Amino acid sequence: MEPLKLLPAFQDYIWGGTRLRDEYGKPCDLERIAESWELSCHPAGESVIMNSVYKGQTLKSYLEQDWAARVGEGAARLSAFPVMVKLIDARQDLSVQVHPDDRYARVHEKGENGKTECWYVMDCDEGAALALGFNRELTKDEFRRAIKQGTVLDWMQLVPVKKGDVFFIEAGTLHAIGAGILIAEIQQSSNLTYRVYDYDRVGADGKPRELHIEKAVDVTKTWPAPPRRNIPLTDYQGYSVALLADCPYFTVTELHITEGAAFPASGGRSYTHLLCTDGEAALVYDNGVAMPVVKGDSLLLPANFGAYSLRGKHCTFLCTQTLPR
């Protein structure tokens, strides 16, 4: 069994740039690449396997052929793959938006998932910032009025960002990624977004992009959001590690490899998704077989994969799993 290299699905939203192609080698001919969906079984864009005997299969098809063995105990209890991992290149400001939780989505959105997410800032322009939650508690009526007056950003916390910052965005948290930020986003497998402000932009059809005011008012937590997470790395011989997020949908770990690190088989507990965010390395498995990995590569190790190691000098990975609870 070999690690599976994944080809992402691409989205060309109007605010996207070209960094994912220019700096991360993403093979896409779109004029702009706003998002690459690196790990996705979502019908709006599925990852495709690039190597092995499964080359050309969608990730969803591959997992469903042996569901429990490939997704692991943590996700096997679910009827669909619970996680999406994406890269976001915000060349322009994203809309001010919010995502519902599972309960609201399943009632009002035909059984769709809600969306809790984790952001890892891979890079950013000097002075870049994002808007996150409110700067004071508002009533629902105050929030609705601010939306209709186009002043909602005046009531939000503006947070300057730097490379390596981490944010955990629970469903119901109003937010907006600012221009000049490159983010790795680990989220529930959902494409539900309720926009409340979009800078009066028009979409590809020449019409203003739709706002979703009443649904947003229903689901938004109208109080200040928790700040960024400053999570120190814990050093071990040859590598460092930090737990970035841990929730029922996903567990995210940052791995910084300085020489090498060995990892045991998961024992069927969870798949492992590895996203190389910086540097280059070798993934060594099956008694010495080495697979080269470079910045931007996205790899899936099914839950029945064996022990492996990562070897390299100053390379960084985000490791995503869905662990048993």
Question: Where on the chain are the PLM-derived regions?
Answer:
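Transition-metal
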Residues: 1-138, 198-228, 252, 324-325
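Ligand-binding loop in jelly-roll beta-barrel domains
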Residues: 80, 88-93, 124-127, 173-192, ...
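His/acidic/aromatic-lined binding-pocket segments of jelly-roll/cupin-type domains
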Residues: 85, 94, 111, 117-120, ...
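Short, basic/aromatic beta-hairpin or loop at an interaction surface
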Residues: 137-149, 269-282
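Loop-centered beta-sheet repeat module
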Residues: 146-194
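Short acidic-glycine-tyrosine-enriched beta hairpin
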Residues: 156-168, 285-305
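Functionally critical, mid-to-C-terminal surface segments that flank or help form catalytic/ligand
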Residues: 211-269
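Short beta-strand segments in beta-sandwich/barrel cores
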Residues: 262-263, 279-284, 298
